[in-house]
UniProtKB/Swiss-Prot annotation:
Coiled coil: none annotated. It comes from the Bacteria. InterPro entries: COD_ChbG_bac (IPR022948), Glyco_hydro/deAcase_b/a-brl (IPR011330), YdjC-like (IPR006879). Its cofactor is Mg(2+). Its EC number is 3.5.1.-. This is Carbohydrate deacetylase. Mg(2+) binds at residues 60, 123.
Amino acid sequence: MIKLIVNADDFGLTEGTNYGIIDGHINGLVNSTTMMMNMPGTEHAVRLAKEHNTLGVGVHLVLTAGKPLLGDVPSLVSSDGLFHKQSVVWEGKINPEEVEREWTAQIEKFLSYGLTPTHLDSHHHVHGLPILHDVLEKLAATYNVPIRRCEEERAVRPFSDVFYSDFYADGVTEDYFVKLKERVQGEQTVEIMVHPAYIDPELVKRSSYVMDRVKELRILTESELPEGIELVKF
C-alpha cells in the first residue's frame, strides 16, 4: 500500500488561499498543510486550523517573502526591511545563525497559538540550502518534528520516501493522481506539494502563481485515489 500525504503550502498567505486549502481538505485530497507565520492571512489560518482539526498543520518556514518577525537579522533583508528575493538567498549570502533565530521565532509564534506542528518545510524550498543543514538538524531535534524531503540535497530527518513538487503549473493535470501508481514503488510514503486557493486581491498582489491555484483546487476536489493508495499524515 502506497502511503500518500497531500500537503498544501502557503496556509496563511491570504484568506482566499486559506479557504481554498480548507475546501481542498473537506472536499478533496488535501490532508496536510503548512502555515506561513508572517503573512496577512496568518491569524485567519490559525482560526481555520482550530476549526478543522482533522487537517495536519506544520510550519512553512519563510525566508523569501514578506517581512521577518525579528528586527535584528541584517543578512536576511534588503534595504526596505523585507526578506531578500529567492535569487539572493540561493546565492547563500545569509547568516545561518540569523536564519536559526528567525525560524525559531516563526515556530514559536505557531506554538503560541496552541497549535502543535506536524512537520516543517519552507517557502521556495530554501531549507534545501547546504549552509542551512545544521540549522535544520537543530530545529528538528528541538521541536521533535520531521522535515520535508528536499530533491536538491541530502534529506534532514525526512518523513517521506519520495517528494514530488511537480503538481504545479503545466504539471497540474487531470490524471495526475491516477498515474501516481506508475511512479511509486509499493509501500513507499509519498508527499505531494500542492497550492490550492481561491483568488483574492491579496493573492494577486503577493504571488505570480495565481490562476493555476484554482485549477489545482478543482482537480484536488474532483480526483479519486486509485486502489492501493491511502492518505496518511505526518
